[in-house]
Amino acid sequence: YLGSIVTIAAVLFLFVVLFSSPVMADENTASEVNTTITLSNSGNVSKMTDGSYNTKTSFASGDSITVTGKDKIYSLYIKWDLVPDEWTLSYNGTTKTYGTNGFLHEYVEIPEGAETLTITFSSNEAICDLHAYSAGTAPSDVQAWKTPCDKADILVFATHADDEILFLGGVLATYGGEQDLAVQVAYMCEFTSSAKIREHEKLDGLWESGIKHYPICGDFPDLYSTSLEAAKKQYIYDDVLSYTTSTIRRFKPLVVVTQDLNGEYGHGGHMLFSHAVAESVESSSEPSYFPDSASKYGTWDVPKTYLHLYSDNKITMNLRLPLSRMGNRTSIEVQTAAYKKHVSQQWCWFYVSDDYEYSCADFGLYRTTVGNDSGNDMLENITTYEEQEKIEKEKAEKESVEASIAAEESSIADVKSNTSNSTRQSGRKIIIFAALILIVIIILFAAYRYYQLIQSRKRHRRHKRK
């Protein structure tokens, strides 16, 4: 008996070990394929396979890359030096066009798989990194970006790459990563013309935070100042207002989140951008306010707007809860890892925290059309777009069922009505027929009586003659 118990326990232990092991959990994850890469030019292959953003291999229009795998290739992951123009990928006798989404880090699926692929360029391009993968789900560090949101549950405005993590990161990990909501990030400053590596780090940090929709960015340079007035001399403020207003109208967010009006540690650029967002949410519903974007996207009145460190209607997010979708890490742990992706900025003193003066957990409700908060949830009094779609679908299904029931009831009523009419008509016919028979009987009876009367009179006359 004891031996049986031991055997059962051993089997259960083996079952738990096998089915909880990382190998079992990851058996459908794609692995990197060993490849031979051949360039049509004299470029250096090692510079686009060394995993560094500081090296690249350049190509001219018409150049090509041939990638041959030891096993079938089912996806490519390319990190471009700059956002590419359109390019083509040929395999298995077909040619497809890519580069249409404007992704700096581009993931391309090849559903049927191919042993040999050819990339052909239509303009001058450069690649920092290229990887090929087998069949299966893309590894977690491969950025399979979705296009920017059609409609955003939450629109996060950040001045620079890394501000969204240091000061607004709890929003990204909690609502974008854990709750898988439509979170869109929009930056003011671009680094393509000044520090290209920060464009790569921006994407790496967002992906680590759980964001899946590709960010958008203004075309404003990164300039430092220590006051709002100084920043307004560096930038054309109306251009910034136009950008923030257009972005709000484009994504129609249910919630807007942006930085501190005082610029966190006093950065004039942060002040400028947060003030622009604050002004835009007040006026984006007016058609006369930047009418070009109103004509293009329509107007929009943002239901809720939060500002970092805003003193009124304060909320404090709980960033110490384990997030199941984020490997059971807390938001603080996720954002700490995300900030480390900004390798070029690690010399700065900044760090991710929810318990110091620039806490990424502290916000204030700057503006609302749906009432104040009673808790610490930015989505309080908000119905997300996915929920709205679900409600509309259920409503449409209910209306369809009700319409079907009404149509069926109407059909039954028509049948009953027709049956009743038919019955009434049949009744009338029976009555008429009966009346006719009665009339015939009466006529026959009258004729018979008349005949009897004639016969009686004849007998009476014969009797008199006798």
Model-flagged regions — what are they?
Residues 455-466:
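Cytoplasmic C-terminal tails of single-pass
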Residues 6-18:
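Bacterial N-terminal signal peptides
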Residues 16-27, 428, 447-454:
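Sec-dependent signal peptide cleavage junction
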Residues 28-56, 69, 87, 103-110, ...:
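The feature marks non-catalytic terminal segments
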Residues 37-67, 82-85, 89, 93-250, ...:
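Active-site rim/loop-helix segments in enzyme catalytic domains that contact anionic ligands
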Residues 265-281:
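Short Gly/Thr/Asp-enriched flexible loops that form oxyanion-binding sites at enzyme active sites
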Residues 430-449:
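Selective detector of the "anchor" transmembrane alpha-helix that sits immediately C-terminal
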Residues 244-265:
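Proline-aspartate-enriched helix->loop->beta-strand connector
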